[in-house]
Amino acid sequence: MFSKKYRLSYLPLFYEDLDEKVTYIVEKLKNPKAANDLLDKVESAIMERLPLAESFEPYHSVRERRYSYYRIYVDNYIIYYVVIDDDPNDLIMEVRRFLYNGQNRGNMV
């Protein structure tokens, strides 16, 4: 069976989103263990998805996009990523956003 290989890439915006959520959990909720657990879950979910990046339903956006967005659910959060396939020999899973599930995502994704 043919298996695609994806290279992993992150946008700075993803790190900003993640830092914002982790900082909130640590500083406002006073729960560093929960923040650390969330980081572990996020890393694990991304690494598990990497070999199968295009095997899930794309996110249906009202805007036309060059690359389809995909989602990974982690607790009450959603990781958004795209697969950049401009070069079939260099497929990139680019992780773009980390948003709270209750956030208005209309103009964020």
List each model region and its residues.
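Conserved short aromatic-hydrophobic micro-motifs
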Residues: 42, 49-50, 81, 95
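Solvent-exposed interaction patches of small proteins and small membrane subunits
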Residues: 34, 38, 64-65, 86
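A general structural signal marking secondary-structure boundaries and capping sites
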Residues: 25, 29, 53-54, 102
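Inter-domain helical "communication" segments and dimerization helices
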Residues: 2, 58, 86-89
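Arg/Lys-rich, positively charged N-terminal/basic patches that mediate binding to nucleic acids
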Residues: 1-43
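A short, surface-exposed loop/turn module that caps and links secondary-structure elements
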Residues: 44-73
